[in-house]
């Protein structure tokens, strides 16, 4: 009897030891300690299988314990971390069917939020990358020539690729090998990359970049409104700064916005109006096709001003900020890649044609905003439509910037820097309204003192556009999915990071130099 008892105890101990070793080996294998030989790789695969069986057995034991009323009532409940495979941050992954649960939280809203089709998602991306900032692309061709045209194509390819890899960073494989969505935003991806040492550093960096880009976008809308109105009515005794003040007075009610329902009704009309404007400009350019100056398109570049063109082109493609939210709200997320391909192909073709045709028409006389080159009668009509579009587009980035600021700095809790902007009944507090008004006034002051559309666009594209579209997505992709990437994917990510970094620094420096030079010229005048 004693021999039988010792034999059973020995078998149990051996089984427990083997399972523990298998579990630890499986965890080490998944953490990145790759095998050096084929035999070791097979061994790790067996360890993974044993690890899976071990966890499945634990889960079955728990289910049996819950279903048996006469079991050990005093037994201690298992810790959740023991029955869920933990990776990276230490938090258990959601179950395989929890994609909607992850997508339904965070910035996506609740489950009752209606999903959008691939066509609607493509329309949103088109609105972002086919906006009125294409008006500065002919100015980029002025300083870049044929290389500027190549960059329009290259930027489309790279931004499409980085958008896809950014979405790939939202997903991971669970213990069953199923790909599930474990993150819901750009900030969540950044925090995951900086965990565990600095779990919030990445999110703060992304938030700062988002705020800068959104606020600069608002400033550009005010700048272009003042510029267009001033050039539309040069006979009126109203300066560009005065037109900017008038535009800001119209925009001041944006401070009272609680949601974008009222503004969203005009988005389709604004987009259609913009396409009509582009068609009018291209039609006028085609009417002067016999005078096109093909010899003016250069194969060489202006070394000092070409980096500004890079920033302008990159800024016209920025859409990465809202791609995680957009993909999370799609009815068929599997169609995201196809949607990105077609939207960026269309944007590349339309931008390239618009920039080339406009530059061929006016050559060296091309201005920062191409509509300023149109004859007076046509320019006034087109510019009024563009000003209306700019004013109606302003609330979108403004509201997004306010939301980022409120979530980052003005939330109730111990981590918040300031108290919440809203009272308990959901009403906006007076000082919160004051801060919103101050943000509108800040965009006005920047537009007054730096009224240079193309230079500001190049500065923003070099500073935050390249960071959010090139640098961070490639860096996050390498950090989170390193073990699963093929060699050519690693090469693409590293190349994009290096090239993007060089273009970002050079573009920022030269845009800043251009602004300083323009400011000195205005001061002398």
Swiss-Prot record:
Keywords: Cell projection, Cytoplasmic vesicle, Disease variant, Epilepsy, Intellectual disability, Membrane, Neurotransmitter transport, Nitration, Synapse, Transmembrane, Transmembrane helix, Transport. GO terms for molecular function: amino acid transmembrane transporter activity; gamma-aminobutyric acid transmembrane transporter activity; gamma-aminobutyric acid:proton antiporter activity; gamma-aminobutyric acid:proton symporter activity; glycine transmembrane transporter activity; glycine:proton antiporter activity. It catalyses: 4-aminobutanoate(out) + n H(+)(in) = 4-aminobutanoate(in) + n H(+)(out); glycine(out) + n H(+)(in) = glycine(in) + n H(+)(out); beta-alanine(out) + n H(+)(in) = beta-alanine(in) + n H(+)(out). It is a multi-pass membrane protein. InterPro entries: AA_transpt_TM. Residues 83-107 are annotated as: Disordered. Coiled coil: none annotated. The chain crosses the membrane at residues 133-153, 205-225, 266-286, 306-326, 342-362, 384-404, 439-459, 462-482, 490-510. GO terms for biological process: beta-alanine transport; gamma-aminobutyric acid import; gamma-aminobutyric acid transport; glycine transport; hippocampus development; monoatomic ion transport; neurotransmitter loading into synaptic vesicle; neurotransmitter secretion. One of its GO terms (cellular component) is presynaptic active zone. Residues 154-204, 287-305, 363-383, 460-461, 511-525 are lumenal, vesicle. The modification 3'-nitrotyrosine is found at residue 186. Changing residue 445 to F: In GEFSP12; uncertain significance. It is found in: Cytoplasmic vesicle membrane; Presynapse. Changing residue 91 to T: In DEE114; uncertain significance. Retina. Expressed throughout the horizontal cells or more specifically at the terminals. Changing residue 464 to R: In GEFSP12; uncertain significance. Residues 1-132, 226-265, 327-341, 405-438, 483-489 are cytoplasmic. Antiporter that exchanges vesicular protons for cytosolic 4-aminobutanoate or to a lesser extend glycine, thus allowing their secretion from nerve terminals. The transport is equally dependent on the chemical and electrical components of the proton gradient. May also transport beta-alanine. Acidification of GABAergic synaptic vesicles is a prerequisite for 4-aminobutanoate uptake. Belongs to the amino acid/polyamine transporter 2 family. It is linked to Generalized epilepsy with febrile seizures plus 12: An autosomal dominant neurologic disorder with variable expressivity and incomplete penetrance. Affected individuals have variable types of seizures, most often febrile seizures, sometimes combined with non-febrile focal or generalized seizures. Rarely, afebrile tonic-clonic seizures have been observed. This is Vesicular inhibitory amino acid transporter. It comes from Homo sapiens (Human).
